[in-house]
A protein has these predicted regions:
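Catalytic center-proximal scaffold of phosphoryl-transfer enzymes
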Residues: 1-315
C-alpha cells in the first residue's frame, strides 16, 4: 500500500488480518477435517514469542500431508493419485502432548515426526526421521580428530546408501517402493542395527558418538517403520520444509503481539502455504476465496486448492 501512496497504520493492518483470518477459518477447518482422513501426516513445531501471553514460550505447530509438490493434473482421476497437499499451522501456548492430541482428535494413521516425546502420547503409529538420526552423527563427526575417520563416518556413509535407494525409487508406486525397500534397504538396516548394538558397548555413553548411537537405538522401531508402507518417507523433511516459511517470517517480525494475532497467523499461513503446495498464487487464491465465501455457499469443497478454478484476470 505504501508504494501506492497509501499510508495505513499498524493497527489497521492488524485488524484487516484478523478479519481476513476469521473469514478464511471455514476453509481452514475443512482442510483440517480432510487432513485427519489421510493415511500419513507429517508434524513439527517451532517456538513463537507472544507479547501479551502469560506463557514465556509459545509454539506454532505444523501438520502436513501430500507429496510436497504441486499435483500432477494428468493423475487427477487416477485411483492411486497422491493424497492432497495440505499444510496447516496450529498455534498453542505450550509444547505439551495435549496440543498434539487436541489437534489430531484420535487420529490413528501414520504420524511422521522427529524424536520429540510429546508425539508418543497420541493414538497414531509413529514413523521416525533418519535425517535427525544422521545429524547426531554429523555432530559427532565434528569432534573427531582432524584428518581421521571414525565411527560417525561409517554411519553417515551407510545412511547415505539408504538415501540413494530412496532417490532411485522416488517415481515408483507405493507398492513398488515397499517391495524395493524390503529387498534393498532392509539388509542395510539390519547391518546398521548390528553395528549400533556392538558400538554402543565400545564408546562412552556421554560422548557425542555415544549420544548419537543411543538416539538411533531409542528411535529404531520408528526409524525402520518406513519399510512397512510405501506411502511413508525415510525422514520428516516434509514437515521441516513446511515450517520453514514461518521460521523465515519470524526472523522479520520477531513475535506476535497477542494470542488472537498468533491464531490469525496460523490460519493465514495455512491458506497461503496450502495454496502454494497446490501450485496456486496465494494472492489470487485468497482474493477468490473472499469473493466466493461472501456468497455463503452451502459447501466449500469446490473452493479447496485442488478443486478450485480461479477466474482468468484480464488486464
Amino acid at each position: 500500500f505504501k508504494h501506492h501512496g497509501i499510508e495505513l497504520s499498524r493497527k489497521t493492518l492488524a485488524s484487516w488480518m484478523l478479519q481476513c483470518s476469521d473469514l478464511l477459518t471455514p476453509v481452514y477447518r475443512r482442510l483440517h477435517q480432510l487432513q485427519l482422513q489421510q493415511a500419513v501426516i507429517h508434524a513439527d513445531e517451532t517456538p513463537l514469542k507472544v507479547i501479551h501471553e502469560d506463557k514465556s514460550q509459545c509454539y506454532m505447530w505444523v501438520y502436513c500431508t501430500g507429496p510436497d509438490s504441486p499435483p500432477d493434473p494428468d493423475r487427477a482421476n487416477e485411483p492411486d493419485k497422491p493424497p492432497p497437499n495440505i499444510v496447516l499451522y496450529d498455534y498453542q501456548t505450550s509444547r505439551s502432548s495435549q496440543c498434539v492430541r487436541d489437534y489430531l482428535q484420535g487420529y490413528s494413521g501414520y504420524l511422521q515426526v522427529d524424536g520429540y516425546a510429546a508425539y508418543d502420547r497420541t493414538d497414531a503409529t509413529l514413523v521416525g526421521c533418519f535425517a535427525h538420526a544422521r545429524r547426531k552423527f554429523v555432530e559427532a563427526q565434528k569432534v573427531q580428530a582432524k584428518g581421521k575417520s571414525g565411527k560417525a563416518d561409517w554411519v553417515i556413509n551407510h545412511i547415505g546408501k539408504l538415501y540413494r535407494i530412496e532417490a532411485e525409487i522416488k517415481a515408483k508406486s507405493p507398492e513398488q517402493k515397499q517391495a524395493l525397500r524390503q529387498q534393498r534397504a532392509q539388509p542395510l538396516l539390519e547391518q546398521l542395527k548390528s553395528w549400533l548394538d556392538k558400538s554402543a558397548l565400545q564408546v562412552p555413553p556421554k560422548s557425542a558418538i555415544g549420544k548419537a548411537i543411543a538416539y538411533s537405538l531409542r528411535q529404531w522401531p520408528k526409524l525402520i517403520r518406513y519399510l512397512d508402507d510405501g506411502r511413508l518417507s525415510i525422514d520428516n523433511n516434509r514437515a521441516e520444509r513446511a515450517i520453514k516459511p514461518f521460521v523465515i517470517g519470524r526472523k522479520n517480525w520477531n513475535f506476535s503481539n497477542t494470542s488472537n494475532g498468533a491464531e490469525a497467523s496460523a490460519v493465514l499461513y495455512s491458506v497461503v502455504e496450502t495454496a502454494k503446495a497446490n501450485g496456486l498464487t496465494p494472492f489470487d487464491y485468497i482474493q477468490h476465496l473472499l469473493d466466493e465465501l461472501a456468497k455463503q455457499p452451502d459447501s466449500i469443497d469446490h473452493l479447496l486448492p485442488w478443486n478450485v478454478e480461479l477466474p482468468q484476470i484480464v488486464l
